[in-house]
């Protein structure tokens, strides 16, 4: 099947399309962490101008604000409020508060900015799919270079960009590294343009969902192949689970109105109740093997979670500590609450921050679940949300939002689309066909 030709048609589509295509170029100069916030806030400003009616073309004005977008803005605003409250509570100083607020604009703030852009700007989801799949092709072509660099024992990292001076979570966000070596077992791992290997697999999983919904068979297989290659080379355990899981869950969640799906679900639920004990045993066995696959990493993650939970409960249950703190030597001084969005939120922003992510995620899943019964874009967006939800248990979403922002744009596009009720549509078609039959019968009798 020939690939449908897709070209950007609006300034917003051009910016999104070419920002994705130039990902590797931005990575080479260490600007990837800077580009996403700049592009995001600029496009958000353009969308705001269009919404208030200052666009030069009346037909280009934005529609009403979807309720889901309001939920995301209010929730991310609550994140900022918790951050400020924690700084005041622990007397961390104005300088630290300003620095953390800028960090919010480059992290959690983007979780509201990019859905807003998707919902309020003239951007087609297909443009995002195709740009991401073209980036996947670039990545596949670069894989031999990355492997060759490891075989040739080139320095790692090659260099750290001087753009690090603008500030960020750490030097890994500005370094150019062709490969890395796992300190726990000596294995080679590749992080591609992400700061670390599991983050690369996370972005690959989001790209997989885009590939599944690209109408071109060629680009579809390019995207799928890239996801598998990146997931394997990154050695991410969660990615290898998420790939089949998202495909299976999408097949179920997007067909809930079909009698066959409901019947199979009833049968499986009954069998699950009758076989609860063997299933739990299998789950326990799988969990043990999953943790043993990289035992040192699992141990560090468990200790980090324990420290974060204990200090949250005993020191700052409402608004958290306000800032990230390094852990003790037993966890190799990794930040407390890292490797897990929920524990990280509890430690840094307390129960307020925890709820500020849980509420919009839950609303988004429910809204897209309804729309996905008949809307193709909503199905893709639901897949993205499923992947994001998976990775809240293995990554810190805040510091990776600059990488998975195309998924947030597609979520926004899906939110602006109207809810379509397939059952009601079928009923209306039956009514229309019945009325047409009555008219034909009446005409023949005349």
Language model: regions and residue ranges:
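Hydrophobic transmembrane alpha-helices and their immediate junctions
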Residues: 2-4, 349-389
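Transmembrane alpha-helices of multi-pass inner-membrane enzymes
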Residues: 40-48, 382-389, 396-446
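Alpha-helical transmembrane segments of multi-pass inner-membrane proteins
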Residues: 129-155, 168-234, 241-252
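Membrane-interfacial entry segments at the cytosolic side of transmembrane helices
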Residues: 124-135, 218, 255-268
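Long extracytoplasmic/lumenal interhelical loops at the membrane interface
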Residues: 281-349, 368-374
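A membrane-periplasm/extracellular boundary helix in multi-pass inner-membrane enzymes
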Residues: 80-87, 144-155, 251-292, 313
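Hydrophobic transmembrane alpha-helices of multi-pass, membrane-embedded glycosylation machinery
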Residues: 38-46, 208, 225-232, 240-253, ...
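N-terminal hydrophobic segments of proteins, predominantly signal-anchor/transmembrane helices
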Residues: 16-27, 41-119, 141, 386-392
């Amino acid at each position: 099947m020939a690939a449908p030709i897709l070209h950007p048609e609006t300034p917003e589509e051009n910016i999104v399309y070419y920002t994705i295509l130039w990902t590797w170029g931005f990575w080479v100069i260490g600007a990837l962490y800077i580009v996403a916030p700049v592009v995001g806030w600029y496009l958000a400003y353009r969308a705001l101008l269009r919404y208030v009616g200052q666009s030069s073309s009346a037909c280009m004005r934005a529609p009403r604000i979807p309720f889901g977008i309001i939920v995301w803005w209010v929730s991310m605003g609550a994140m900022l409020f918790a951050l400020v409250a924690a700084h005041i509570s622990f007397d961390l100083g104005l300088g630290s508060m300003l620095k953390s607020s800028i960090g919010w604009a480059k992290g959690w703030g983007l979780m509201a900015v990019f859905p807003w852009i998707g919902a309020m700007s003239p951007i087609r989801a297909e443009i995002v799919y195709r740009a991401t799949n073209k980036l996947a092709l670039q990545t596949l072509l670069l894989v031999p270079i990355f492997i060759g660099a490891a075989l040739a024992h080139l320095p790692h990292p090659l260099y750290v960009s001087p753009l690090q001076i603008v500030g960020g979570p750490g030097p890994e966000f500005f370094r150019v590294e062709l490969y890395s070596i796992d300190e726990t077992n000596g294995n080679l791992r590749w992080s591609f343009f992400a700061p670390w290997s599991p983050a690369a697999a996370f972005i690959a999983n989001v790209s997989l969902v885009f590939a599944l919904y690209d109408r071109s068979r060629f680009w579809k297989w390019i995207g799928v192949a890239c996801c598998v290659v990146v997931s394997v080379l990154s050695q991410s355990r969660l990615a290898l689970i998420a790939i089949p899981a998202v495909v299976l869950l999408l097949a179920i969640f997007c067909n809930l109105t079909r009698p066959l799906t409901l019947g199979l679900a009833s049968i499986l639920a009954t069998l699950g109740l009758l076989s609860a004990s063997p299933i739990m045993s299998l789950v326990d066995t799988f969990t043990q093997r999953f943790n043993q696959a990289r035992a040192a990493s699992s141990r560090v993650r468990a200790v980090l979670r324990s420290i974060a939970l204990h200090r949250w409960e005993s020191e700052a249950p409402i608004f958290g500590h306000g800032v990230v703190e390094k852990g003790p030597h037993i966890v190799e001084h990794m930040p407390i609450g890292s490797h897990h969005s929920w524990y990280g939120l509890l430690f840094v922003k307390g129960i307020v921050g925890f709820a500020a992510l849980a509420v919009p995620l839950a609303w988004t899943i429910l809204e897209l679940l309804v729309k996905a019964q008949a809307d193709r874009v909503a199905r893709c967006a639901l897949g993205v949300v499923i992947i994001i939800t998976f990775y809240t248990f293995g990554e810190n979403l805040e510091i990776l939002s600059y990488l998975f922002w195309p998924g947030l744009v597609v979520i926004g596009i899906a939110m602006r689309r109207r809810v379509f009720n397939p059952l009601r549509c079928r009923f209306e078609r039956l009514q229309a066909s019945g009325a047409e039959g009555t008219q034909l019968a009446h005409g023949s009798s005349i």
